[in-house]
């Protein structure tokens, strides 16, 4: 092994130098592919395929980091691992992006035609796939690119067709006329979960609907007067006495001068508004149901682009919102508008284009969901089919959605996607559904619509493994997959659909565990979004701090299922942690002497610090294994941090210096082995989270194997268990910290020798402190060191209480008593003034109402800090006044 020098391991951690080129080395070494070891247990994850709509955001970075930790850890635990990458064509989202780009060039998709437009989308896909690949590489994701899939691949298209055809033949896919959510900009139907509801300003328009016999009118309140031309009835509740004698009579529909009946239906809420509602079966899902019950005509008044059609009379050709204004003006002119009542109400908007969604009568393809949902709900009671949600509470979210499910509209009026495998006979209108086109294709026309993106995504865990070929090697070896990692926001969109499709077509759960994480928010707790301009590009963070620091932040700041707030301060703290590891690694490696092969520590050579170190390492390994198995990566990170910083760096490395710089060659050789082994183990433990830096450092240590990526994971060793050493070192460290704390308060530097008196309440500590005095004294620099149960408390002494003892350090020789009292009195007064100043702000209602929430929170934090400082200062002053 080449000796460590400034050339082989730089004096200072430089994340750019460490990470540059390392990913390509891993790819060249082929370490991300499955091992192929048939004796090893398989473990597989399929990546939630990112949309090819653009660059990956911080949520993707979080999601994929969690997956990478799982797969890297399982790989070095000895599993035959597969992490399968891929991307989603994202039908409406990608098409909307490309159409927006074309609009800037003054072109529409209709100008190009379907074939040329789809080619443009493929070009977009290729461009952003390269971007995503680059981002995956920067993140250090250990993906097997030889198995990468795309949701429009030929193989996946075969799976999609197979599922569609089978569900159709089973009577679970049907085509029918129904009210759907309609996006007028994308000109396509949307499922309920593709609609986002926002509070918008609107109005209740109170309109007179005159009786046909001229005897008066009924008052109707509507938020959507533009749909009036599609009204076919007015409905009242059967028990509403106000209208009992009116049921069956006719009204004149304003503006249309068409007669419509008054009907009674239990759907109407008699307490809401006037208790009478207009029924528009072609423009409202509830009205559609009422219309079916009463055999009402369905009059669609809108085109697919949101303009009014021929059924809208003189308003034909107007945009829907222009038509609203025109109709309201005409109603007012005709004396039929009673009043306009401003309101704020929840209005559905397209998730992708942002436009207001229309409820529109349309012929679409649907999946009959009840039988599929019932089977999936039942499977949660069967141990071999149950999907375990982590955290468990999200199983309720999943089941609640499944129990209240509606039929799923799966057709989309788009050009980018899986075209529906249905053909209509040009002469007879007969429908044919099949894997292949009819042989006499000249007599048939294929349905122009494509399938909802989520239809193909729902098949992702098994379609990527070669299904419907159940003899495909990957399907047989790696399906069902083991763990899905995803956000709670797409449990209904994606998780639920993968489960019911997996159960229906493979008769197995698609994954055993689904690890749910929250949303990535900004430092103020707001969801990151384009509209707020608060999104953070993970590549910018990597440029400044490195992928390892970002990855460490992403897993240590939260628990499963919780949202997390992005914090540059915490990413910087992660970088500082890595820098600490770098520094102790350099120290260890530059003090290994001629040790050039890895060796096992020999417990027979251990001093107390060695026994303690390896007992702590053993416990850390056990905790990490337990926490990672439960996906508690945040707690796992804190456990690793504690060992690395508080055990190895702060104490053991410092303890080792006396031996390493001494003359006992045998002791030095043993200490080198112990340092190298401990560092090797912690690098292996940290590698799944921070692969770049720990891969680099591990290669500089004595090692076997070509890469830390495939190096075996640490295993707890019972020979290292030592409760006595742990309790002894805990007491010694507490003693050292206690003395240091007294020194700090007294302003006495370590170079100044002090008397130390330790009064014991636990006599068992006496031999521990006395036998390890030489070691303790290196950290406390005592002039005299007295330990016993009968030690008297000296006057004017600083003190600290630890488990089993009280420490005293006489201060009379260290400080000027009067000068220190004066200083503390002055400090206390200044702190009281600061607290009073903040209280004045916090008691000012003007400040509280106008200042940003973050500013108010900062003032409260400052006040709390000042309170703590004041308490400490007063306690110190009281201590000196008693002396």
Curated annotation (Swiss-Prot):
Any one GO biological process: valyl-tRNA aminoacylation
Coiled coil: 811-883
Record bears the keyword Transmembrane: no
Enzyme Commission number: 6.1.1.9
Entry similarity comment: Belongs to the class-I aminoacyl-tRNA synthetase family. ValS type 1 subfamily.
UniProt remark on domains: ValRS has two distinct active sites: one for aminoacylation and one for editing. The misactivated threonine is translocated from the active site to the editing site.
Protein name per the record: Valine--tRNA ligase
UniProt source species: Lacticaseibacillus casei (Lactobacillus casei)
